[in-house]
Swiss-Prot record:
GO molecular function, one term: peptidoglycan lytic transglycosylase activity
Function: Murein-degrading enzyme. May play a role in recycling of muropeptides during cell elongation and/or cell division.
Residue numbers with lipid attached (S-diacylglycerol cysteine): C17
Family: Belongs to the transglycosylase Slt family.
Reactions that this protein is recorded to catalyse: Exolytic cleavage of the (1->4)-beta-glycosidic linkage between N-acetylmuramic acid (MurNAc) and N-acetylglucosamine (GlcNAc) residues in peptidoglycan, from either the reducing or the non-reducing ends of the peptidoglycan chains, with concomitant formation of a 1,6-anhydrobond in the MurNAc residue
Lipidation (N-palmitoyl cysteine): C17
E.C. number: 4.2.2.n1
Protein name, UniProt field: Membrane-bound lytic murein transglycosylase C
Location of the protein in the cell: Cell outer membrane
GO BP term (any one): cell wall macromolecule catabolic process
Cellular component terms per the entry's GO annotation: cell outer membrane
Length: 360
């Protein structure tokens, strides 16, 4: 009788554990399918571009590069947020000037809703906005910012008359126009998100300067940011890792959707929540706040586990070693001994950017 009673108590727990395990397995299977599906999509997308533009002319959107194809992949707009340039190109054999003109106008006047534009297709889904994303970041030949279609059209005509260039890919002629963004374009983009950053900073107790430094390093404040790893948005949040961790900590099931992470406020909230998790949970045992900040920055790029393994394969021992080192030694160790060159550079970039934002 006691055995039956004990089984009666344990059975619900076993069922609960089993259902959780089944749900986790189902989630992992879905993640694998999503990842494989994304890889297939990217491969087909690159193939479509290569067929028209040639192998050396394949250009795909990235964290700091907005690239949108239209006209059956024959026309593209590329905003390089690092270099501060807009390049509009066409390889079309018919009416290249008209195609360029249309692409220039729509690029200058597009809105700032990344969820409305599919960067992995040639669908012309760019909507002209009364509040263009690039407003204030680019000026016309008279030095005026561009908000309305009339001014954008006149500027496009001017560019085609005075700045049109051509080159050959070996088989076809590519026509292009390049526009420079204003010198302080980075600050102008950052200013758009200050209110959202301030709100997330207060909510999660993360320094505003760190959030801004992460955003600059990850995307150069490009809300359309994507990556080969399928990291999304301003803070380059990966749905199935950081996004999943944050949702779990907030009592939510699954992962944030692409549309959720392309929303600037949701992206900043999720990225900042993850920074707080790294600081308070995964790396919370590091006592010196500066040392912990260096660890958190590096972990945002390469994971908390890889940070700790730089010091020891045992997590507790790694924390003890870090706590015995000066912040300067922790910084030197992470920027010289972390196995990932990207993570080593990442700490330097974010730390440098954060110093700049602290002075503002």
């Amino acid at each position: 009788m006691k055995k039956i009673f004990a089984l009666a108590l344990i059975a619900p727990l076993l069922i609960s554990c089993s259902s959780k395990k089944n749900a986790e397995n189902a989630y992992n299977e879905a993640w694998i399918k999503d990842t494989n599906g994304f890889d297939i999509l990217m491969g087909q997308f690159a193939h479509n571009i290569e067929n028209i533009w040639g192998f050396n002319e394949v250009l795909i959107a990235g964290p700091k590069d907005y690239v949108k194809y239209t006209d059956q992949y024959q026309t593209r707009s590329h905003i390089n947020f690092d270099e501060g340039t807009i390049t509009v190109e066409t390889i079309a054999g018919t009416e290249p000037a008209a195609r360029l003109r249309r692409a220039i106008i729509t690029t200058l006047l597009m809105g700032d809703d990344p969820g409305s534009i599919d960067l992995y297709s040639d669908v012309n889904d760019i909507q002209i906005s009364r509040e263009p994303f690039l407003y204030g970041q680019v000026v016309d030949n008279t030095g005026q910012p561009i908000r309305w279609e009339g001014r954008a059209s006149k500027f496009a005509d001017y560019l085609l008359q005075t700045h049109l260039k051509s080159r050959s890919n070996g088989l076809r002629i590519i026509y292009s126009v390049t526009i420079n963004l204003v010198p302080n374009h980075l600050d102008k983009r950052a200013h758009k998100y200050i209110g959202m950053v301030r709100q997330a900073s207060r909510k999660y107790g993360v320094d505003e300067s760190l959030i801004l430094a992460i955003m600059q390093t990850e995307s150069s404040f490009n809300p359309y940011a994507v990556s080969h790893a399928d990291a999304l948005g301003l803070m380059q949040v990966v749905q199935h890792s950081a996004g999943k961790d944050v949702f779990r900590s907030q009592g939510k099931w699954g992962t944030p959707s692409r549309s959720y992470l392309f929303d600037p406020q949701s992206n900043i909230d999720t990225g900042t929540a993850y920074l707080a998790m790294l600081n308070n949970v995964y790396l919370g045992g590091i006592t010196n706040p500066t040392s912990r900040r260096y660890a958190v920055i590096t972990a945002y790029n390469g994971g908390a586990g890889s940070v700790l393994r730089v010091f020891s394969s045992d997590k507790d021992q790694a924390v003890n070693i870090i706590n015995q080192l000066s912040p300067g030694d922790v910084y030197e160790t992470l920027t010289n001994r972390h196995p990932s060159a990207e993570s080593r550079r990442y700490l330097y970039k974010v730390n440098t950017a954060q110093k700049m934002y602290r002075r503002k």
